[in-house]
From Swiss-Prot:
This is Apolipoprotein C-I. The lineage of its organism: Eukaryota, Metazoa, Chordata, Craniata, Vertebrata. It comes from the Eukaryota. Transmembrane segments: none annotated. One of its GO terms (cellular component) is high-density lipoprotein particle.
Amino acid sequence: MRLFLSLPVLVVVLAMVLEGPAPAQAAPEISSTLERIPDKLKEFGNTLEDKTRAAIESIKQSDIPAKTRNWFSETFKKVKEQLKTAFS
């Protein structure tokens, strides 16, 4: 049964591969691709900058840093007190 189903699928895939790329999928010229690289890099940089700024602002406005700082302070105080009592 599995072989019966896989043979038609294999034939369809083989036909698609042998057909080659469609005209719209054909590779563009190298010169036009090279001309677009600086624009693409600038766009990528701007997008990355915007996302980074948004992430930093979201972290600044959340209360996670304050909670983390308080937790570390409390834990440090507890450890410090335990060491004082243990070595006194």
